[in-house]
Amino acid sequence: MAPKYDFDKVIDRRDTNSFKYDALDEMYGRNDLISLWVADMDFATPDFVVEALRERLDHPIFGYTKPYDSYWQSIVDWTYRRHAWAVEREWLCYIPGIVKGIAMALHAFTQKGDKVIIQPPVYHPFRLVTENLGRVCVENPLRCDDGIHYRMDFEQLESIIDEQCKVIILANPHNPIGIVWSREDLQRLAHIAAKHNLIVLSDEIHCDMALYGNRHTPFAAVSDEARRCSVTFAAPSKTFNIAGIVSSYAIVPDAHLREHFFSWAEAAELSAPTLFAMVATEAAFTQGDEWREQMLCYVEQNIDFVADYMAQHHPEIRVIKPQASFLVWIDFSALGLQHDALVDFMVNRAHLAMNDGAMFGRQGEQFMRMNVGLPRAMLHKALQQLTEAISTL
C-alpha cells in the first residue's frame, strides 16, 4: 500500500537562508508576512529524494563526478511515462537552471540587437535575461476577452514578426496564469515559427504539474515543424520541491540546433550535471509517481479552497484557476486601488507577500500571483488576513 504523505505539516523555513522567507525584509520592507510569492512549495521534499541524497552523503568524498547512464535514462523514462514523448538520450543536455538555459540559447542562436518575442503577462526573467544580453524584447500579449480565459493572439504575432525576430520564448504551461496549451495552439505556433525561421525556447518547468485532468503537451512533440525549431527546458525542481538543487536539462531533437546549443554549452563548461542534481533527479523520476499524485491532489484542493473562499467572502475578486502548477493569478481590480496602493495594501495591511502582477508585464498591474503550495492552515490564515484588511477599505 502506498504511503500517505502529510502536506498539512507546517515546517518553519526561517533562518535557513530561504529566499522565500529570509529575504522578506529586503524585498518587502518587513518580515512579518505570510510568504505566498517565490515559486517553491512549503511541503517537505519527498523522503525518497532525501534518502538518496543521504545515502550519497555517507561517502565522505564529493569529488568530480562523471555523468552516469541511469541519470539520463531516468529523464528519458519519466518523459515517456508522463508525456508519451519518446526522447532520445543524445537529445539531452544538463543546464544550470532554466533561465540560464534560456540565456545559453540566446547566446547560441542570436546576436545583440536581435528581437526576441515574449507573451505577457509572463514569467519576468524572460524579459530580464533578453534585455540584459542586449537583445530586444517584442511583446505578443495574451488576449483575455472575458476577464478569465487567456489565449494566444496569433494575428498580432504574425504582424510583429520581421527579419530581426529570431526567437519566441514560450511558457508551457504558462506562468503566471497556469494555462495548459492545447496541441492545436502549439501546432499553430510551430507553423508560424517555421514559416518565419524562428526558434522556440519552450520553458516546461511546470510540465509535471498539470491539474484537474488536464494533460501537458510538450511543444516539440506536436509536429515535425515543432521538433525542428525548438529547444525545450525542464526540471524536477518545481514538482519535487528541490529548486535549491539545480537539476535542469534541455531537450533538443533537431541535430542542427543541437550542434549549436551543445557546442556553446560545452565551450562555456556549463553542460556537466552536478553530483547532487543527478542523485536527486534520478530518485525523483524513478520513485516519485505516487508522491506527485498526492501532492497534485492537495494543490488542487488548495486552489479550490481559495476559489471557494473568494466566491463566498469577496465575489468581486476574480480567481483564475490554473490548469497547471501551484500558482494562482488573481484579479484585484475590484478593490479600486491603483497599482502602487494595491501593492502597499497587500504588504502593510493584509501582511501578505505575493508577487506583484506588474512584474509579469503591464497587463498584470491589478493582479497578484499567489503561491498555494503550502499547508492549508497557513493558506486559510492568509485569506483571513486578506478579509480583515479588505474590511478596512
What function would you assign to each model-found segment?
Residues 108-130:
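Conserved PLP-anchoring active-site segment centered on the Schiff-base-forming lysine
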Residues 51, 224-300, 390-391:
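Conserved core segment of the aminotransferase class I/II
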Residues 143-214:
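Active-site phosphate-binding strand-loop segment of PLP-dependent enzymes
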Residues 282, 298-307, 319-332:
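Conserved glycine-rich beta-strand-loop-beta hairpin in the small C-terminal domain of fold type I
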Residues 2-97, 104, 284-286, 392-393:
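N-terminal small-domain helix-loop-helix segment of the aminotransferase-like
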Residues 114, 135, 195-198, 227-228:
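A short helix->loop->beta-strand "cap" motif at the edges of active sites that frequently abuts
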Residues 158-159, 226, 338, 345-354, ...:
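PLP-dependent enzyme catalytic core of the Aspartate aminotransferase-like
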